[in-house]
């Protein structure tokens, strides 16, 4: 599979991990594969995945602030901004002010938790931080845990959460919903979108980052919400199948090795 020549610029704001193919590094690799030009500004430098202890986190708020100011002076233009891991409210405000001032199309992954729990080590106000950022986002891509957190657990059904966000003008994609033996991606574009996928009883770090970046690339390429979701599902299935063949016990995805083969 070859990517088309594009060269449109995306501003990527996410964490940078010194160990592991996840976070902003994975997103940048995938978006580069689709021939987008990426400016990657890290919100934090992190020693390793949150699942591994201990962990060291360096707050790069000053760098974020100064770099965005530099880019503003350079009059850089972006097709979109993607925001993932945010460390604190100060960063959220800096980013959202930049989005508002430059009238940017924003895609947000509210990285807060999974399996019903908030990740350890996050800001105690992390839910309020991402609720604030969601007001500025055009597309929001949480897992089910994060979707519930964004709505203060008001809704029992995932479909009601998607409805809620559509009613306030947001496109909302829940990356993983389980209903009996079914596993599907849930979204809505006038009508509900349920895209089934094959459930793997394996967990690779960076799967969420993979979804974010593949979806963003496809959506910006064709501006078709449903098609972008379908293409994302199919591409992830292909990549994870290749990862299992490479090393099914790996903590993360060998993204650069895999992209070379596509």
Model-predicted regions and their roles:
Residues 210, 214, 218-222, 235-242:
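Solvent-exposed, amphipathic alpha-helical segments
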Residues 120-193, 226:
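Conserved phosphate/ATP/ADP-binding segment of small-molecule kinases
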Residues 7-13, 189-200:
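Glycine/charged-rich beta-loop-alpha catalytic/anionic-binding loops adjacent to active sites
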Residues 196-215:
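Short glycine/threonine-rich catalytic loop with a Thr-x-Gly-x-Asp
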Residues 2-120, 256-259:
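Conserved N-terminal subdomain of the carbohydrate kinase-like
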Residues 37, 191-193, 218-232:
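Phosphate-handling active-site elements
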Residues 226-262:
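Charged C-terminal helix
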